[in-house]
């Protein structure tokens, strides 16, 4: 099977894992006035890409992807636990668990994942999103770069959807913003594949946004 179909499937916002319900702190950044327009939105997204995702989140996922594809279940366990421990707030932890569980349910209902992958996924209680994403890559025969690029695109598309629902930002403006971010996305993905997985991150702004979102008066999103 052509891997482009599997990559598009994994990257799609139509993947039934509930990503549209979450903003990953962006809604709180909007409420606090840190993000006000397309320019400040771009600054927020580039900071997330360069300072958080490319340096910690994505290298950790890349390591988990490589371990899953190789069938190194001990390494999968270690990477999955690091990912679980790195969720700094209740909302971010719940988001990862809910989306991971939904992707697990999807993979269990489809024929592609092998017995070893199913057995490992079943031992997670429940799997976080990174763990389930790695098993989806194993099921659909995607290498680490393909699965990681799908993850980056899924993240960007979700963030743009949040902005279109919360800012005076139309579809054309969102596509212009996406065009301006593609080189940053490319660099972040390449950097993540080069970097070793590290033990922790220091995305204080994201953590603060997520914490304040828990008590935000009016919310559209669950994170």
Curated annotation (Swiss-Prot):
GO terms for molecular function: nickel cation binding. InterPro entries: UreF, UreF_sf. The lineage of its organism: Bacteria, Pseudomonadati, Pseudomonadota, Gammaproteobacteria, Pseudomonadales. This is Urease accessory protein UreF. It comes from Pseudomonas paraeruginosa (strain DSM 24068 / PA7). The gene is ureF. Belongs to the UreF family. The keyword 4Fe-4S does not apply. The keyword Phosphoprotein does not apply. GO terms for cellular component: cytoplasm. It is found in: Cytoplasm.
């Amino acid at each position: 099977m052509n891997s482009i179909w599997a990559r598009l499937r994994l990257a799609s916002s139509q993947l039934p894992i509930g990503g549209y319900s979450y903003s990953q702190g962006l809604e709180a950044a909007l409420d606090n006035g840190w993000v006000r327009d397309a320019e400040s939105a771009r600054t927020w997204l580039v900071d997330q890409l360069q300072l958080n995702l490319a340096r910690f989140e994505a290298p950790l996922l890349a390591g988990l992807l490589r371990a899953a594809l190789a069938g190194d279940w001990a390494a999968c366990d270690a990477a999955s636990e690091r990912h679980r421990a790195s969720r700094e707030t209740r909302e971010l932890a719940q988001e990862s668990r809910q989306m991971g569980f939904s992707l697990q349910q999807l993979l269990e209902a489809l024929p592609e994942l092998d017995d070893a992958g199913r057995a490992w996924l079943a031992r997670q209680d429940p799997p976080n999103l990174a763990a389930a994403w790695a098993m989806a890559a194993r099921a659909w025969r995607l290498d680490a770069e393909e699965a990681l690029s799908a993850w980056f695109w899924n993240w960007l598309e979700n963030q743009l959807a949040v902005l279109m629902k919360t800012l005076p930002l139309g579809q054309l403006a969102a596509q212009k913003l996406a065009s301006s971010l593609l080189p940053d996305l490319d660099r972040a993905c390449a950097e993540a594949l080069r970097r070793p997985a590290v033990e922790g991150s220091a995305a204080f702004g994201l953590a603060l946004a997520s914490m304040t979102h828990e008590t935000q008066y009016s919310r559209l999103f669950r994170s």
